[in-house]
Amino acid sequence: MARVVPGFTFLFFGFLGLISNIPAEAAIKNYQFDIQVKNVSRLCHAKPIVTVNGRFPGPTIYVREGDRVRINVTNHAQYNMSIHWHGLKQYRNGWADGPAYITQCPIQTGNSYTYDFNVTGQRGTLWWHAHILWLRATVHGAFVIMPKPGTPFPFPQPHQEFELLLGEWWHADVEEVVKQGTNTGLPPNMSDAHTINGKPGPLFPCSEKHTFAIEVESGKTYLLRIINAALNDELFFAIAGHNMTVVEVDAVYTKPFSTQAILIAPGQTTNVLVQANQVPGRYFMAARPYMDAPLSIDNKTAAGILQYKGIPNTFLPTLPQLPAPNDTEFALSYNKKLRSLNTPRYPANVPLKVDRNLFYTVGFGKNSCPTCLNGTKLLASLNNISFVMPQVALLQAHYFNVKGVYRVDFPDRPPIPFNYTGAPLTANLGTAIGTRISKIAFNSTVELVLQDTNLLTVESHPFHLHGYNFFVVGTGIGNFDPVKDPAKYNLVDPVERNTVGVPTGGWTAIRFRADNPGVWFLHCHLELHTSWGLKTAFVVEDGPGADQSVLPPPKDLLPC
């Protein structure tokens, strides 16, 4: 999880075995991922979990901008598997994107599939994770893209780097927890702990040896690559006694700013610089949920340790002052500070003219379910449509013109306007269901406004768009006003990312240019909401040029 810069070292699991560093030139990077079940002990209890190469979290992928990456995944577990390379744009190459039944059929037990893609025009911290069922609870890892040789960071060079993956842990088998929730029609049980690099930390029982620690030297600067791999929780993260300087989110450089804590939603990444400038000692790094919706409070705090060199382990650490779990003011203020670097080398190419305006409401609902506990089951929807997963991958159906798999009639707006963020609505909560997606013209510019609603309850939702980055041009609390709110947009240096939070009882506006043909998933990155149907997809048409259409599928394309 750590590297020294320059001359960094790392673990590289490839076809060629253990390699010690990244070659300076662009290269082909080969990895072998074996999906294996392994017994792991946490919180005084052992259980079998699904892993990559027997590791939890899984191995970090290290590449340089411009490299070609080939990752062969062999499934030895009892579950079907697919791996998503979260934030990789996969230009024209949705075959390597990974979400099951969207761009590929899953890898069945005993089978293999090779993800073969180029890392073009991207550098920074991304990650990979399972994209089927809830298996990403334990099947995930970092994906670090170093700049091209000779290209420095646009911030002070750190002495050393560490990846921190924030996650969740359940005592029970996660898939059994989900199955129980599905059978009752109610939310499944919350996780029993949060983790830092798979370890809950000493605030949990039987966790003294399950505590992640990093060692620092006084006067030196460190880069933390922080990834929220949790399934269902936005998280605050802070280090006792130390400020952090945010320099990148979702593998895009930002204008640096100092903060005592960060807010990071599932799917997002944040790079921060930390100066070891405090009295030498041991300091807790801590993460706990941000939950401002009127729901059950999850107040479990994961802790790791930042330890100065030479300080004994008997030295008692101090805890950081994290924002309160419902500190919406901090959350809104923090997100407003995120701005693109917008320099000649790293411009913010914000679409100023919009060809297609989309307005999607985000909400919950209830449909009839005679076998469920209360005769109903909870659902989630966009524009009152709960997405139904197909039995054939959407990209295959699109490419091979297979009829009857999906409909391209997803509405640009909700069927009935209402007071989206007024008093909670508890009647007429039925939702339509279907595999309905939206067709987007190649190279058109799109503005999408995501509006939270009061259907059952308001709640924050982190949305991830596959195949693209987008600019977050506006956000606000209450109902989006299409006349007044666009005048307040930031069209100069808005933050660019691949996953954005829709605030509780509010809205977020994003813009992107649809220049990547294929079928691209759009979904809430809270796994619970995704499983309830809070998802859809864009099918972006081919362009007129020879290099503007979906690439042919790989020879090992999997059947469903």
Regions found by a protein language model. Give the residues of each.
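Histidine- and aromatic-enriched segments that form or immediately flank copper-ligand environments
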Residues: 29-155, 233-262, 282-298, 369-513, ...
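Conserved small-residue hotspots that stabilize compact domain segments
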Residues: 240-250, 254-257, 261-313, 318-321, ...
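Boundary at the C-terminal end of the N-terminal hydrophobic targeting segment
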Residues: 24-28
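Intrinsic disorder/low-complexity detector
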Residues: 317-358, 391-392, 397-405, 409, ...
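Low-complexity, Pro/Ser/Thr- and charge-rich linker/hinge segments at domain boundaries
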Residues: 148-162, 310-325, 544-553
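Acidic-aromatic/histidine active-site loop/patch
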Residues: 158-231, 319, 334-338, 356, ...
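Cleavable N-terminal signal peptides of Sec/SRP-targeted secreted and luminal proteins
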Residues: 3-23
